[in-house]
Amino acid sequence: MDQLRQSLLDAPIIEKGDYEYFVHPISDGVPMLEPGLLREIVIKIIRKANLENVDKIVTPAAMGIHISTAVSLMTDIPLVVIRKREYGLDGEVSLHQQTGYSEGDMFINDVNEGDRVLVLDDVLSTGGTMKAVLDALDHIGADVVDTVAIIKKAGPNELDDSDHHVKTLINVTVEDGEVVIVDEHGDD
């Protein structure tokens, strides 16, 4: 059975303003994340992503961390977390991200010009976070080998008119307070 698909169909929906938001272990940490679901997702990422010559996995805090940690453990590729806190370290790069329900600054450390990176995140919805991350990595001069989001919420996003392509594991929409699977295989 496809645990990711079923877990999304079972996900509760809440409203944040005009935004219908599904609550899911991958995107929210609640309900609890079962090891089998995480394992299934990691295997799918490893099969879908281009990992050849990747130097670093890069993920925004906070909900990309558990996924990226598991992928790092399975591939022996080091992990860089883009933090919401500034540390003032040499080479730190700031970015501003805006989503459908929040905005703020984030900070990248330990990514340098010429680094070959895999960008991982939990959800691609408005594209605000992913666009800000990819633009910052371009500014640094990193080579983004591949970009993967676990779940894509259907609809327009900020990456639609950009040169950036994001692979996904599953695409969904929310209709009448329920998650609907749009593409159970996601985007390649």
Curated annotation (Swiss-Prot):
Keyword check for Zinc-finger, yes or no: no
Q: Name one GO biological process term.
A: purine ribonucleoside salvage
User: Which CDD domains does this entry report, sorted A to Z?
Assistant: PRTases_typeI
Key words of the record: Purine salvage, Transferase
Enzyme Commission identifier(s): 2.4.2.-
Q: Name one GO molecular function term.
A: transferase activity
As for what it does, the entry says: May catalyze a purine salvage reaction, the substrate is unknown.
Indicate the family of this protein: Belongs to the purine/pyrimidine phosphoribosyltransferase family. Archaeal HPRT subfamily.
Task: Give the HAMAP family listed for this entry.
Answer: Hypx_phosphoribosyltr (MF_01467)
State what protein this is by name. HGPRTase-like protein 1
Q: Which organism is it from?
A: Haloferax volcanii (strain ATCC 29605 / DSM 3757 / JCM 8879 / NBRC 14742 / NCIMB 2012 / VKM B-1768 / DS2)
